[in-house]
Each structure stands twice: as structure tokens, then as C-alpha cells.
Amino acid sequence: MHSCNPYFYDVMRRMVNQHPKLDKFDNARLGMGWWTNRIKDFGFGSNLGGHVPGTRAGLVPDSTYYNNIYGRRHWTFRTIYSISIGEGELLTTPMHMANLAAIMANRGWYMEPHLERDIGGKGKP
């Protein structure tokens, strides 16, 4: 059995630890900020289905979130790496995952997600 998790752990580690002159705490803080901004570019952490009842924004943790939980300079990559595989404190919805798939299918172009009431004018199923 093989897993892609180690690949995504490594990608996250390289993003978080990209400043060799900084200590592990400052690296985590700066890298977490960069990661948070990139994830939000894909719509995570926002309510994508404003016109769909019951949709939620989910949660994309940031440095402030971890500082509130662990305290400043008390968390590192080892504390946060589970979010690199969509676990831990990262909260998503089915709408977020559908939106991510749509962005990839549209070659990086974002289109506001919509739910269809009927297909081909045949009315509700």
C-alpha cells in the first residue's frame, strides 16, 4: 500500500521552512502565513455557496490561530503538518472540494459555483 501523504508533508515542510537564517518558530509563522494565503486563493475559508442554504466557510488556520492555542513561539512545522493532507484544524465543505476540482478542470480559472435546479428544461427530478 502506498500513500501520497509523505509527498504533501514534504511540500508543506519546504513551504514552512524556506528561511534558513530564521529559527524554527519564525519559519513556522512566516511559512504558515504564505500557506494560508495560497489556500485561500482556492476559496477555502470563505462561504462559496452564498446562494445555497446551509453552506459554511470552513476554517483555514493561520499564525494567529496557532498562537492563540499554543502561544507565540511554541509551535513549529511538527505541530501543523497534518493540515498539509487536509486533516487537523483545516475544515472544508463539499462545496470547497467541488470548487477545487472545478478550478483544476478549468485550468486554473475560478468560476463561481452554482447548483442547477434542472437540466435541459425538464424541471426538477
Where are these regions (language model features)?
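Beta-lactam-recognizing serine transpeptidase/beta-lactamase-like catalytic domain environment
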Residues: 1-125
